[in-house]
Design a protein with these regions (language model features):
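Membrane-interface anchoring segments and C-terminal beta-barrel signals
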Residues: 6, 55-157
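Active-site beta-strand/loop architecture of penicillin-binding DD-peptidases
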Residues: 1
C-alpha cells in the first residue's frame, strides 16, 4: 500500500506547503554491503552490534542478529531474518515562505518579493532494524536519500 498526502495554507503573507509519502503493510528483504558481516570486505553496521554470543545469551541480553562468522553459513542465505517491515512515513517536501507586502515591494521597484526555506527528506518514521537502511531503498550498499535544504528569494519586476 503506497500513499501520499499534501497540503498547505496561506496567512498574511506566510505560506506553508508539505508532502508526506509512505507505505503500509510492505516488507523488504535487505541485502548489500553491511547486511552480511563476511561479505564485501567485512563491512559491519549497527545491525551486528547485538549479534548472538554465548556471553550475551548467558547474560540475558537482547539478541537482534545471528552469530557472526567469517565464513558463509545459513546466516548468509536469504531467510526471514533479513525480511523487514519497510512501512514508513516520510516528510518528503516542506516549504515555508513569506511574501513581503506590496507597499514595501514598490519602495524597491518590484511587484513581489518572496523568501522561502524548503527541504526534502526531512524525517522518516519507520521500523527498520538499522539506521543505515532506508525503507524506500532497502539495500545497505546504495546511497540513502539525501536530506536537502534550499533557501530562495523570488523577485517579480
Amino acid at each position: 500500500h503506497f500513499y501520499n498526502f499534501s497540503g498547505g495554507f496561506k496567512y498574511k503573507g506566510f505560506e506553508v506547503n508539505f508532502l508526506f509519502q509512505g507505505t503500509g503493510k510492505f516488507s523488504r528483504c535487505i541485502s548489500g554491503v553491511g547486511a552480511y558481516e563476511s561479505e564485501y570486505q567485512g563491512v559491519f553496521t549497527d545491525l551486528h552490534l547485538q549479534a548472538w554470543t554465548p556471553e550475551r545469551w548467558n547474560n540475558g541480553e537482547e539478541i537482534k542478529y545471528p552469530a557472526l562468522s567469517l565464513r558463509k553459513s545459513t546466516n548468509h542465505q536469504p531467510n526471514s531474518f533479513f525480511i523487514m517491515d519497510a512501512s514508513y512515513l516520510r516528510l518528503k517536501n516542506a516549504e515555508i515562505a513569506y511574501t513581503l507586502p506590496v507597499n514595501i515591494c514598490r519602495k524597491v521597484f518590484t511587484e513581489r518579493i518572496r523568501f522561502s526555506l524548503s527541504g526534502q527528506n526531512l524525517f522518516t518514521i519507520d521500523n527498520m532494524r538499522s539506521k543505515f537502511i532506508d525503507p524506500e531503498v532497502g539495500n545497505m550498499g546504495t546511497f540513502q536519500p539525501y536530506r536537502v535544504y534550499n533557501i530562495g528569494v523570488s523577485l517579480t519586476f
